[in-house]
UniProtKB/Swiss-Prot annotation:
Pfam families reported for this sequence: Ribosomal_S16 (PF00886)
Cellular component aspect of the GO annotation: cytoplasm; small ribosomal subunit
Region (Disordered): 81-122
Lineage top rank: taxon: Bacteria
Protein name as it appears in the record: Small ribosomal subunit protein bS16
UniProt cross-references to InterPro entries, sorted A to Z: Ribosomal_bS16, Ribosomal_bS16_CS, Ribosomal_bS16_dom_sf
Molecular function in Gene Ontology: structural constituent of ribosome
Length: 122
C-alpha cells in the first residue's frame, strides 16, 4: 500500500480549505484517508500563523513509515523543518514557445522588408 501525505479539499465554492491527510495513493482526493495531520487555509495571508497548521510529530512518524508527500505538502514540511526539499530550477520557463519564436521572426523579416521598400521608394 503506497501512502501519500496530501491535501484533501473542503470548504465552499470559491472558498477552499484543505486538510493535510495521510491517504492511500489509490483513494480519491477528497475520499477516504487514514489520518488527518493538519490544515491549510489558502485564503489567509501568507504570513498568518494559522495558514498552515501541521502536527509535526505525526508528520515525522508517517515520513519514517514511508509516506511520500506531494509537492505542495513537501513545501509545508520543508518550511516546518521536517524534510529537505530541493529547489526546482527551470531556466527555460520565461522563454517563448516555438510558434511564438517563428511569429517574431516573421514579423522581423516583414519589418526589414518594409523598411527597405520605403528606403528604395524615396
Amino acid at each position: 500500500m503506497s501512502l501519500k501525505i496530501r491535501l484533501a479539499r473542503g470548504g465552499a465554492k470559491k472558498r477552499p480549505y484543505y486538510r493535510i491527510v495521510i491517504a492511500d495513493a489509490r483513494s480519491p482526493r477528497d475520499g477516504r484517508f487514514i489520518e488527518k495531520i493538519g490544515t491549510f487555509n489558502p485564503l489567509l495571508a501568507k504570513d498568518a500563523e494559522n495558514r498552515v497548521v501541521l502536527d509535526a510529530d505525526k508528520a515525522k512518524a508517517w515520513l519514517e513509515k514511508g509516506a511520500q508527500p506531494t509537492d505542495r505538502v513537501a513545501r509545508f514540511l520543508d518550511a516546518a523543518g521536517l524534510m529537505k526539499r530541493d529547489a526546482k530550477n527551470n531556466p527555460k520557463k520565461g522563454e517563448p514557445g516555438e510558434k511564438a519564436k517563428e511569429r517574431a521572426k516573421e514579423r522581423a523579416e516583414k519589418a526589414a522588408a518594409g523598411s527597405t521598400e520605403d528606403a528604395a521608394a524615396e
